Design a protein with these regions (language model features):
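C-terminal segment of classical bacterial N-terminal signal peptides
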Residues: 21-31
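Short, well-structured alpha-helical segments that form the helix of a local strand-helix-strand
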Residues: 167-176, 337-340, 344
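Substrate-recognition/cap regions that form aromatic- and gly/pro-loop-enriched pockets
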Residues: 345-469
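Accessory, solvent-exposed terminal regions and/or long lumenal/extracellular loops of proteins
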Residues: 285, 290-354, 358-363
Length: 508
């Protein structure tokens, strides 16, 4: 996640340059640190597919869960990160979102619908920021002033798409027409298919239907390699010039068997990747039992940069795969939730608690989403959104039937709550706004990160027990949800269950 704001966008809105420059300084700046995960159903205990993402941005940064209503034809999507605009030619769909606070976006309430499910059962997690190489940049340069970007991906996908494939195809058409303003990866799913969509350069893109017998972990690396058949439209969709453009420009790369290598052609080189990224990759592979070997697959190094703190972390000997097979099957909902809190505790030299390295369960997590998809179920109930609005190392994921929810728990602070509590350094004597689970979890994690060896240990044990309780309770809710056959009845139950789970978590 980058969160960049070009000056031209402020000019376009008629704001003076002097004010615009000051505003930019107060807005979020580039933050290339998120971790995306996927676990195919063949490896899970319940036979469900799971995917999600941890967003990293700042130690105390407020996020909001809410519902965007449906709109009449003519609804306009726009952005202040670029000049992108799109007007819908049909009624839009209601969807859930996780968004930023308006105070960080000039009062805009639509910034970054990064995780949600729409009323048709389409879900998405957006975005994982990536990078492209110099040759791709020279051939098809990304102009940050124009094109579709992470400010709008989620809103467009969820507001417009009745299936995951529709979402993929719509993004592709928009990129063909307007280009993109950033390199990103997005996961889009429904009750039948899960797709990984990647923007490769300004106008080149690829989408791959994810298999049931693989896992995936990506900590912002655009060059993780994969094998894909570009001539199989059932499982792969892509821009028309994905291969012909780099061939014409002279930078196309091919594997040893003569197959066009998408990741190597467009992705950043190994030399341009960073130790913070590879540390998370090694930590994640270890968590999933598909370990890399220090001294063979990677080394632990310290990078010194002029004027910046030293960075200690992992650097691999060669580019690693985007997809792998975990070391076991039977992954549980709890284990997959906790994967986002992984701090490398079992990796010698890459334990964030003792070795000063970056990690997946970072103190800079702001929001974590995990989608549990039951293949073939009715789209209204097929997907459960497990949502954490604070740092995964010391947080709890709340289960939400977001395709049906129309009433958000009052314990989820809406976008009218003050952002000021994020700036507090002494959370013991500065209480959070009343009935705000967003701030409660933020404050708990702040205290635990300050006291990891004392408070952190006991709180994590308590939160684990609470998380398991939520998982077990939701099985009872799910049985009732599946027994209900009407949309009205399911909606009432989804609203009631979401409010109860949120309030109970807040109270406990």
């Amino acid at each position: 996640m980058r969160k960049t704001h070009p000056v031209n966008a402020l000019k376009k809105l008629g704001i003076g340059l002097a004010f615009g420059a000051a505003t930019i300084m107060s807005m979020p700046t580039s933050a290339l640190a998120c971790t995306q995960m996927y676990m195919g159903k063949n490896y899970t205990a319940d036979g469900n597919t799971y995917y999600g993402r941890a967003e990293d941005f700042d130690k105390r940064y407020l996020k909001h869960y809410g519902i965007e209503p449906a709109h009449e034809p003519g609804f306009k999507y726009s952005s202040i990160e670029s000049a992108f605009e799109y007007t819908s030619n049909k009624p839009t769909y209601r969807y859930s979102y996780v968004r930023d606070h308006p105070s960080n976006w000039m009062g805009r309430t639509d910034a970054y619908s990064e995780a949600g499910i729409n009323e048709k059962g389409v879900s998405c997690s957006a975005t994982l920021s990536t990078s492209y190489n110099e040759e791709a940049d020279a051939a098809d340069h990304i102009d940050e002033k124009v094109g579709l970007g992470e400010y709008s991906y989620g809103s467009i996908i969820l507001g417009e798409s009745a299936t995951a494939r529709e979402g993929v195809e719509l993004l592709g058409r928009l990129i063909d027409d307007q280009g993109v303003c950033t390199n990103d990866q997005i996961i889009i799913a429904d009750n039948n298919e899960t797709w990984l969509f990647a923007t490769l350069s300004a106008h080149q893109w690829i989408a791959m239907k994810l298999a049931d017998d693989v896992a995936s972990l990506n900590p912002n690396i655009g060059s993780l390699n994969y094998d894909v058949d570009l001539d199989d439209p059932e499982n792969c969709l892509h821009s028309e010039g994905i291969e012909s453009m780099p061939v014409e420009k002279g930078f196309a790369k091919y594997s040893a068997d003569g197959k066009f290598d998408v990741a190597q052609t467009y992705g950043e080189s190994l030399a341009d990747s960073g130790v913070n990224q590879w540390s998370r990759y090694v930590q994640g592979r270890d968590y999933f039992g598909s370990q890399l070997t220090e001294g063979t697959d990677y080394d632990i190094i310290t990078v010194k940069k002029d004027g910046k703190p030293d960075q200690k972390g992992a650097m691999v000997s060669e580019i690693q795969p985007l997809f792998f097979r975990p070391g076991k099957s039977g992954w549980s909902t709890f284990e997959l939730i906790r994967a986002f809190g992984n701090r490398g505790e079992n990796v010698p030299g890459l334990n964030a608690n003792t070795d000063g390295v970056y990690c997946i369960g970072s103190e800079r997590n702001t929001e974590i989403n995990l989608f549990q998809i039951r293949r073939g179920y009715d789209p209204e109930v097929a997907t459960i959104q497990w949502e954490m609005l604070s740092r995964a190392a010391y947080s709890v994921a709340i289960p939400l039937y977001s395709a049906l929810i129309t009433e958000v728990s009052p314990y989820f602070s809406d976008q009218t709550v003050s952002f000021d509590h994020c700036k507090q350094t002494d959370v013991v004597y500065n209480e959070e706004p009343e009935n705000s689970i967003n701030y409660v979890l933020m404050d708990i994690s702040s205290l635990c990160f300050e006291n990891p060896d004392t408070l952190g240990i006991s709180v994590r044990a308590y939160l684990d027990a609470l998380q398991n309780e939520l998982i077990e309770q939701n099985k009872e809710v799910d049985a009732a949800m599946l027994a209900e056959t009407t949309t009205e009845g399911r909606t009432a139950l989804a609203n009631k269950a979401g409010k109860a789970a949120t309030e109970n978590t807040y109270v406990k």
